[in-house]
Design a protein with these regions (language model features):
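Membrane-interface transmembrane helices that cradle and orient dolichyl/undecaprenyl
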Residues: 112-117, 155-171, 181, 205
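Perimembrane helix-loop-helix junctions
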Residues: 2-5, 10, 158-164, 191-222, ...
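Membrane-lumen/periplasm interface segments of specific transmembrane helices
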Residues: 211-286, 311-318, 375-382
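Transmembrane-helix motifs of polytopic, lipid-linked glycan transferases
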Residues: 94-117, 150-158, 285-289
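Short acidic/glycine- and proline-prone juxtamembrane loop motifs at membrane-interface regions
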Residues: 39, 134-147
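Signature aromatic-anchored transmembrane alpha helix within multi-pass, membrane-resident enzymes
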Residues: 119, 123-124, 176, 193, ...
């Protein structure tokens, strides 16, 4: 019998290694023009990593402690900066090339385990994974999901090993991976929940041993998260930053959840009822599969059941989180952990269903799967072509675009930073851009729903300050430029198509333009 871990060896997984190299090259070509993609969250990670690498602690670009995100990903980046002595803006694409290669290679090994008798299924699914826009749009950016998805696959492997051996060592490895994932993304708690659920429902584990394993796993699994939350609470009085109440209902989030799956597998153009039905069907299917594996305990810890259990736990977590807490709407990025946990078990389901049919029914079903594969790949190609054209012509969308690097307003600020008096505050609707391209610290303009923010800003009118305004960053949730110009006095220092730079002198507090 082939040793369990040998299916991850280069000899058995060479095709995944080739696919991984192709994936790494894709990241290189997508980032060749403007470097690693940068979103607002990326600037928080980047600035915090720089702060840690320079020995200043977990402080983000606004000069405040980072609490909206856990410390794991910035710590990971800071270690790379410290070892390489190269800033992550210059090396980020190389880091992501390595992470994407590793992700694809692990997928190949897992497929080897899931589909041991039907090797032909591996290549088509590797192609889907390598060229998936859902993954490429993550791994071309500086985002915590790039590390989190890899840790999720490592968790699958470790939990499978635990299921084979049931030793303390394998349990501790699972707990460490799950625990560390919690400080890469707070959603890492879903790994703790998935493993805890599987251990709890493990029929072969005697009660005394089960209780001991659950206590040990739970203690290690949540230790990192608890430490991170305690640190946040001691520093700011909040566990995970300032969280607002959700504006979307449970059913609205179910609809968004289904639409994201439509984006994953390109059925989003179907009528709404079908989109929701198909999206929810994945969830129901993996609940059913877990019940089946519960009664077939000899296969309880196979990769199919591990992926399916995680899929169910993460789905419940993310939909409920979006219902009770306000953050960006459910999208490919937030649901990216579901993509592989949904796709990998299908490498068993597809050939299994085909094997149950004979004659024209078998060939008919094979034809359907081939057509689906071709259609999905065609749409993936179309999406990737548009994405690649944008990346090669002007840089990846966001702060890696040429328009930001060539911004007259930012170049004006960089040309003579001395004009910005030390101690004089800077306000901006795009404070991430001010930090990234000038190195200066800027505060975000007040939120319209936060009376405290606006009162503090009004008190600032007694002092000199600068206002950097970018039209592309204007957000209805924050105070508008029209309101600022109407209620305060400003001297215009620079004007360009993308924005304006103003100075507010304290001596003109009671005047208006």
């Amino acid at each position: 019998m082939i040793p369990d871990i040998s299916l991850f060896s280069l000899k058995k997984n060479w095709d995944a290694a080739v696919a991984g190299l192709i994936g790494a090259l894709l990241i290189y070509f997508f980032t060749r023009h403007g470097g690693i993609g940068l979103e607002p969250d990326s600037i928080v990670y980047l600035s915090t990593a720089r702060s840690v690498a320079h020995g200043s602690g977990f402080f983000e670009f606004e000069g405040i402690p980072m609490t909206d995100f856990p410390v794991g990903y910035p710590l990971f980046l800071s270690i790379i900066i410290f070892i390489s002595r190269v800033d992550i803006v210059q090396s980020g694409h190389i880091v992501n090339m390595f992470l994407y290669f590793s992700l694809i290679y692990l997928c190949g090994g897992i497929i080897n385990h899931i589909s041991t008798r039907t090797k032909w299924v591996k290549i088509p699914f590797l192609i889907l994974i390598v060229f998936s826009p859902a993954l490429l749009t993550l791994y071309t950016y500086l985002l915590s999901e790039t590390l989190f998805l890899l840790m999720t696959l490592l968790f699958f492997v470790a939990l499978h090993q635990y299921g084979q051996k049931k030793t303390i060592l394998t349990l501790v490895v699972v707990a460490l991976i799950a625990g560390l994932s919690c400080i890469v993304r707070y959603a890492g708690v879903t790994l703790v929940g998935a493993a805890g659920l599987m251990i709890l429902l493990d029929k072969k584990l005697v009660l005394k041993k089960k209780i001991g394993h659950l206590l040990l796993f739970g203690t290690i699994g949540i230790a990192f998260l608890v430490a991170n939350l305690v640190r946040n609470s001691l520093i700011t009085g909040m566990l995970t930053g300032d969280r607002e109440k959700s504006l979307t209902s449970f059913f609205e989030n179910i609809q968004k959840y289904a639409y994201v799956f439509g984006d994953f597998f390109y059925f989003h153009d179907l009528p709404l009822a079908f989109v929701i039905l198909i999206g929810v069907s994945f969830f129901v299917f993996y609940i059913y599969s877990h019940i089946i594996h519960f009664y077939k305990s000899n296969r309880y810890y196979n990769y199919w059941n591990i992926c399916g259990t995680y899929f169910v736990v993460y789905t419940i977590f993310i939909v409920l989180s979006a219902t009770f807490s306000r953050f960006e709407g459910l999208n490919m990025r937030l649901l990216s952990p579901l993509y592989l946990s949904c796709l990998l078990p299908l490498t068993f389901v597809t050939p299994w269903v085909i094997s149950k049919l004979n004659g024209w029914k078998r060939y008919g079903l094979i034809s359907v799967f081939v057509i689906l594969f071709v259609v999905i790949n065609y749409y993936q190609y179309k999406d990737n072509r548009v994405f690649y054209q944008a990346a090669t012509e002007a840089g990846l969308p966001g702060y890696a675009e040429d328009s930001w690097r060539n911004s007259p307003i930012l170049n004006y600020i960089k040309s003579d930073k001395k004009r910005f008096k030390e101690g004089t505050r800077i306000y901006s609707d795009g404070n991430e851009a001010v930090y990234l391209f000038t190195g200066l610290q800027a505060d975000l303009v007040p939120h319209v729903e936060s009376k405290g923010d606006y009162e503090n800003f009004k008190e600032e009118q007694q002092n000199d300050y600068y206002l950097v305004w970018f039209y592309d960053c204007a957000d209805p949730e924050y105070v508008s430029l029209v309101k600022l110009l109407k209620e305060n006095y400003y001297v215009e220092l620079a004007s360009a198509p993308e924005g304006r730079l103003y100075f507010h002198p304290s001596s003109k507090v009671n005047q208006t333009k």
